[in-house]
Amino acid sequence: MKLSINIDNLIPARRVCKTDMKVTENSKQAQRKEVMAVLAHSEAAEISGRLEAIALPAHENLRQPEKGLVMVRGRIGGDGAPFNLGEATVSRAAVRLSTGEVGFGYTLGRDGEKARMIALCDALVQSDQFADVVESKVIAPLRAAITAKRNRKSAEAAATRVDFYTLVRGEG
């Protein structure tokens, strides 16, 4: 009787472990996605300056930085039928660390060096040894700079806001 209870409890435990693994994989994927967004919105000089503060491991370019075109698709009103809006230039690169992690970098424009640095950061974020260092010395300061810039632009836009209800109503 005790054996059957243990077996019955083992099956849900396996399901929980699989679910936990899936959540962990999804959170790592979400973290990489967020890191890529921060790097894509940062200037190449800022990324380069932050990377200089880290002792970078040996790495090789799997794919030399290259430039190409992508088709930008649009939708009218955000939910209409998709149409081809136009083409945009992009740069991409791939880097492999000596420990085996592979990183990919894409950025709008023709800045191949920025794409290579993004790929290097992507590989470093996947590494257990360098993930925390890259987060604290590269990603967090860049994220803070982007947030400050957005807040400053929002404040500038808010300062020029006109409340038409107050204008039309008038006094008297």
What are these regions (language model features)?
Residues 20-55:
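N-terminal, charge-rich interaction modules
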Residues 77, 88-90, 112, 147, ...:
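Short capping/connector residues at structural and topological boundaries
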